[in-house]
């Protein structure tokens, strides 16, 4: 999947929300590792936990270029104070994954290649 992505993908700073609590996919998670292999930058790179609970203000300050989230968590994410001012949200640079896609993304195992393709398709849509 990574071989099909444009070089501009490497400049994309991405936030992946795995749960509305909110928990994000850190660099040490299988999701974060997949994102790195695809060439994008994880805004949670410095987080020591695989799936850290995130302070919403951290994401607001980080100003990711792209946000990946499940469709079912999208509404609550968009209602967070200040998030409507984020460029990624104002410019609709969001990938909202259907429940079946989200299920593939958040479960490690034999479908990890499929998860990589789902993420790669999202990245392709927003790389210039």
Q: Where are these predicted regions, by residue range?
A:
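N-terminal ligand-binding lobe of clamshell/alpha-beta domains
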Residues: 1-128
């Amino acid at each position: 999947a990574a071989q099909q992505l444009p070089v501009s993908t490497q400049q994309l700073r991405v936030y992946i929300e795995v749960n509305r609590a909110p928990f994000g996919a850190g660099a040490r998670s299988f999701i974060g590792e997949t994102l790195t292999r695809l060439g994008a930058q994880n805004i949670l790179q410095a987080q020591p936990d695989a799936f850290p609970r995130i302070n919403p203000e951290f994401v607001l300050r980080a100003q990711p270029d792209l946000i990946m989230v499940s469709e079912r968590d999208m509404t609550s994410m968009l209602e967070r104070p200040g998030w409507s001012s984020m460029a990624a949200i104002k410019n609709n640079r969001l990938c909202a994954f259907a429940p079946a896609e989200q299920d593939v993304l958040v479960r490690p195992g034999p479908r990890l290649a499929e998860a990589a393709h789902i993420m790669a398709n999202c990245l392709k849509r927003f790389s210039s």
